[in-house]
Amino acid sequence: MSDIIHLLPDHIANQIAAGEVIQRPASVVKELVENAVDAGASNIQVNIKDAGKTLIQVIDDGKGMSETDARMAFERHATSKISTAEDLFSLHTMGFRGEALASIAAVAHIELRTRARGTELGTCLSIAGSNLESIEPEACNEGSIFSVKNLFFNVPARRKFLKSNETEFRNIINEFERIALVNPQVGMSLYHNDAEIFNLPESGLRQRIINIYGKSLNQKLLSLDAQSSMVTISGFVGRPDSAKKRGALQFFFVNGRYMKHPYFHKAIMQAYEQLIPAGDMPNYFVYFTLDPSSIDVNIHPTKTEIKFENEQPIWQILMAATREALAKSSAIPTIDFDVEDAIDIPVYNPVKKSEPSTYKAPKVQVDSSYNPFDTTSYKKPEFDWSKLYQGFENDRVAVQRESETFEDAPIEELPAEASDPEKLFTEVSNPCYQYKGRYIVTSLKSGLAIIDQHRAHVRILFDQYLSNIRQQQGVSQQVLFPEIVEFTAAEAAVLPSLLEDLCFVGFDLSNLGNDNYAINGLPAGIENLDPVNLVKDIVDRAIETGCAVHEKICEAIALSLAKAAAIRPGKSLSLEEMDHLIASLFSCSDSNLTPDGKTIISMLTDEELERRFKC
C-alpha cells in the first residue's frame, strides 16, 4: 500500500491559516493597523475602496523596515515581537504570532513600500497569493504603506460569502474604533471611497471618545478609577439615564487590547441593578492594566478572548468601582448609617416668657355618651357605606394603573380584512375586561382568552407599517421645527440602505453633512414620540440584526415603529377600544405571536376550567 499522507504546499497551508485569521476585510484592517501601532507610529491613515473588497491601504510613520525585514515579514511565524515561549506571558504588543501578513498575502495582492528610520532608500515589494513577484529599492517616506488589493481573489468561495458593502464597511469601522479607543495618543484617520469618515487627532481618552461618538456623549460619562496591587481599572461608565435597549457602547480593554468578557459584563450590570429598566444596557469604556503574566491572550485566533488568573477578585473590584462611580454622580442614593435609624424627635427649644409660645397641647376627643355596658349607646358613624357601591354595577373594567410615565398612544386602525368575518364577529362580540391595565380578558369559542394589550398593538401596528412600506403609502406629518440627529460613523454607514424605506413609512430626512441629519417629517400617529430616539432605535435595530436583505430591513423599521407607538402597560382602555383592538388583532397575519416571537394570547380552555373545579 502506497503512502497517502503528505505535507501541504506552503501556499495551501497559508490559505488554511488565513481562514482563521482573515475572515473579512475588517480583519485585514485590524492586523495592519495594530502592526502600525506596534511600529511606534504617531499618525495612521486608512484608505478603503468598496468596503475593502477592492483596496485596503494603511499608511503609517512608524519605524519602517529594511529590505530583509520586509521580505521576512511575509513568512509564516516570522515576528519581531517574541523570541522564546516565556515571552508569551510578558506581551506588550498587539501582534506576536507572525501569522497575519502571511495569511493576508495568501489570499490577496499586496504591495509594500517601507523605509526604516535613518536610512536613505526604501523598499517596494509585491506579493500575490504568497508568491513574491518583485522586490526593489525605492525612494519613499519613513514608515510603511501596505496596499491590499483584490481580497480573496484566489478563494472565490470566501469572496462569495462576503456581506454587502454596508455590512462589511460597518465591521471595518468597528475594528477601527476599537483600536482608536485604546490608542488616543496616536492620530488616526479613515477614508472610504475618498470620503473622510474619521479624522482623530492625538488627544486624551475622553476627548477621543467624544470625537468618535459625538459631543452629546460627554455629559453622560462618569469617570471610573480603581487601583490595587492586582489590577488598575480606569475609563468611563455611562449615567443610568443614558442606558438603552440596543446600540449601547460597551468596551473592555486589557493592557491595550480589546476583549470580550461576559463575566466582567455581569459585574457592570450588577452595579446598575435597580438603576436602569430591565433589558436596558449601559455604556461603558473599561480599561484594565495588570501584569501580563497573569493573563493568557493566546487562546483565540482573533485574541478577543482572554483568560485571567485572578478573575473573581477583579470582578469584585470592577463591580465596586462601578458602584462608586455611580454613587459619586448621585445615581445611587447614599445612606448615613449614623442617623438613618434614629427616631425623629423634635428638639425642645424653650422660649422666653415675653415671646408667645407656638406649642399647643394635644386635644383628646372623648365620647361622653359611650357606655361600655350598653352596646346601643355609642354614636353610629356618619359615613354612608352605601356610597362605596355606587356605580359598581356599571363599572365593568377594573383598571390598576401600574405606570403613569408613558404617553398615551391612540390605537391605529388596521385596514385589513378578517379571513372569516362571521367567525371573527362571533368571537369578539363577548364582553371584555381589563386586568391591571395590561391584559384584556374575554371569552372565545375555544375558552377564556387573556391578551397582552401592548403586544397585541405591536402586532397590529407592525402589519400596518410593513404594508405601508411595501405599498409605498406611508403618510408623513411635517414638523414645524426640524430635529437634528447626530449619528456615529457606524450608524451613518448603514443609514443609506434604510433611507428609501424610511421615506415609504413616512419619515422625511435630509442630510446635513458630517453624519448629521434633519428630521423634517414623521409617520402620522407618532407625533408624541421622541423622533431622534426613534430614528436611532431603527438604525440600531438594523445594525443589531445585521440586515442585508431588503425585506429584513423593512421588517426592522416596522418593528421599531410598532414598539415605539404601541399602547403601554397601565393604559386604561374603554370597552370600544378593547373590542376594536381584539378585532384588529384577529385580522392580522399572525394573532398569536409578535413579530419578534413573543406570545400575545394565552388560552384557558373549557376543559382546563372544568378540571380546576372538579375538586
From Swiss-Prot:
<dbReference type="InterPro" id="IPR020667">
    <property type="entry name" value="DNA_mismatch_repair_MutL"/>
</dbReference>
<dbReference type="Pfam" id="PF13589">
    <property type="entry name" value="HATPase_c_3"/>
</dbReference>
<dbReference type="InterPro" id="IPR037198">
    <property type="entry name" value="MutL_C_sf"/>
</dbReference>
<dbReference type="InterPro" id="IPR036890">
    <property type="entry name" value="HATPase_C_sf"/>
</dbReference>
<dbReference type="InterPro" id="IPR014790">
    <property type="entry name" value="MutL_C"/>
</dbReference>
<dbReference type="InterPro" id="IPR014762">
    <property type="entry name" value="DNA_mismatch_repair_CS"/>
</dbReference>
<dbReference type="InterPro" id="IPR042120">
    <property type="entry name" value="MutL_C_dimsub"/>
</dbReference>
<dbReference type="GO" id="GO:0140664">
    <property type="term" value="F:ATP-dependent DNA damage sensor activity"/>
</dbReference>
<comment type="function">
    <text>This protein is involved in the repair of mismatches in DNA. It is required for dam-dependent methyl-directed DNA mismatch repair. May act as a 'molecular matchmaker', a protein that promotes the formation of a stable complex between two or more DNA-binding proteins in an ATP-dependent manner without itself being part of a final effector complex.</text>
</comment>
<dbReference type="InterPro" id="IPR002099">
    <property type="entry name" value="MutL/Mlh/PMS"/>
</dbReference>
<dbReference type="Pfam" id="PF08676">
    <property type="entry name" value="MutL_C"/>
</dbReference>
<dbReference type="InterPro" id="IPR014721">
    <property type="entry name" value="Ribsml_uS5_D2-typ_fold_subgr"/>
</dbReference>
<protein>
    <recommendedName>
        <fullName>DNA mismatch repair protein MutL</fullName>
    </recommendedName>
</protein>
<keyword id="KW-0227">DNA damage</keyword>
<keyword id="KW-0234">DNA repair</keyword>
<dbReference type="InterPro" id="IPR038973">
    <property type="entry name" value="MutL/Mlh/Pms-like"/>
</dbReference>
<comment type="similarity">
    <text>Belongs to the DNA mismatch repair MutL/HexB family.</text>
</comment>
<dbReference type="GO" id="GO:0032300">
    <property type="term" value="C:mismatch repair complex"/>
</dbReference>
<dbReference type="GO" id="GO:0030983">
    <property type="term" value="F:mismatched DNA binding"/>
</dbReference>
<dbReference type="InterPro" id="IPR013507">
    <property type="entry name" value="DNA_mismatch_S5_2-like"/>
</dbReference>
<dbReference type="GO" id="GO:0005524">
    <property type="term" value="F:ATP binding"/>
</dbReference>
<dbReference type="InterPro" id="IPR020568">
    <property type="entry name" value="Ribosomal_Su5_D2-typ_SF"/>
</dbReference>
<dbReference type="InterPro" id="IPR042121">
    <property type="entry name" value="MutL_C_regsub"/>
</dbReference>
<dbReference type="Pfam" id="PF01119">
    <property type="entry name" value="DNA_mis_repair"/>
</dbReference>
<dbReference type="GO" id="GO:0006298">
    <property type="term" value="P:mismatch repair"/>
</dbReference>
<dbReference type="GO" id="GO:0016887">
    <property type="term" value="F:ATP hydrolysis activity"/>
</dbReference>
